[in-house]
């Protein structure tokens, strides 16, 4: 393991303060801007231009926010013909990166993006996977903050390294072989977070093969939020997920999508609805189709 030098002059707040683990509103974040025990991440990203949103970040962001790039910071190296489009990084490398960004054991992390929260959810899930639970996604994200004319900044912060213990959550990540076995197991539910059209095998614009993993059920992550970008009521989300799970224990379900992004949004919505943690297939559809021997289905579930 590595060590990160503990800063001597950084004063941290009372660790007994409320811990936010799923969602947080703009008013609460505004009240904590500048607090040493709060770290903000801007996760805006464009799948068609990996650098576009970082340029937007430099043009203006929530004060104190650190930019986290999906491809560079939250994904590992792509292995052509083997991995998905956004594979998970090595956990120790990812842990080191977060520590260098100033995350300590009692630090509250807030994450936002410019869309429904899928990229922010990837960082949210990643931190929880490493064992840090004090992380929440900003309700409505960048659009909600701007719509209220709240403060903006062009200053790029210089975080002071800190350290939280690495406690990797065993069993949260599954591989393609596990998914293959699950596809024929009635006690396991595969949930696909992509749009319903891509699930059916229509309008596939990101991956060279269309369709879905046999046995999966479609639950588009966009259905977790309303037109205003706010998450649906927790009880409504709970009923929706119970319908898709259809008696399957939530711990036994596996979430996937195109490359392990919108699946994290579904996992966030499940947590918001009061469910325990499910499992993630991070390689998702883009990894599944790299092996022509793996079965493919099309049409509705």
What are these language model-derived features?
Residues 13-301:
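Cytosolic catalytic domains that perform sulfur/thiol-centered chemistry
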């Amino acid at each position: 393991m590595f060590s990160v030098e503990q800063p001597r002059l950084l004063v941290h707040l009372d660790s007994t303060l409320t811990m936010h683990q799923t969602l947080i509103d703009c008013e609460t974040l505004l009240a904590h801007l500048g607090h040493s025990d709060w770290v903000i991440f801007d996760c805006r990203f464009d799948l068609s231009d990996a650098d576009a949103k970082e340029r937007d970040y430099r043009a203006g962001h929530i004060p104190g926010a650190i930019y986290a790039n999906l491809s560079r910071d939250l994904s590992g190296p792509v292995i052509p013909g083997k991995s998905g489009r956004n594979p998970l990084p090595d956990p120790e490398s990812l842990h080191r990166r977060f520590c260098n960004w100033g995350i300590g054991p009692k630090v509250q992390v807030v994450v936002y993006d410019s869309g429904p929260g899928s990229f922010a959810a990837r960082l949210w899930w990643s931190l929880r996977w490493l064992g840090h639970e004090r992380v929440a996604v900003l309700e409505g994200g960048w659009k909600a903050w701007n719509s209220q004319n709240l403060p903006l900044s062009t200053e790029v912060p210089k975080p002071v390294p800190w350290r939280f213990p690495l406690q990797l959550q065993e069993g949260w990540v599954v591989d393609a072989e596990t998914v293959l076995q699950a596809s024929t197991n009635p006690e396991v539910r595969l949930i696909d977070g992509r749009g319903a059209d891509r699930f059916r095998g229509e309008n596939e614009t990101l991956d060279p093969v269309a369709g879905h993993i046999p046995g999966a059920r479609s639950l588009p992550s966009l259905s977790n939020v309303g037109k205003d970008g706010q998450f649906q009521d927790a009880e409504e989300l709970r009923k929706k997920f119970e319908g898709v799970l259809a008696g399957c224990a939530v711990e036994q379900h596996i979430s996937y999508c195109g490359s392990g992004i919108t699946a994290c949004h579904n996992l966030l919505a499940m947590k918001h609805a009061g469910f325990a943690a499910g499992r993630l297939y991070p390689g998702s559809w883009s990894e599944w189709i790299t092996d022509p021997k793996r079965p493919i289905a099309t049409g509705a579930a």
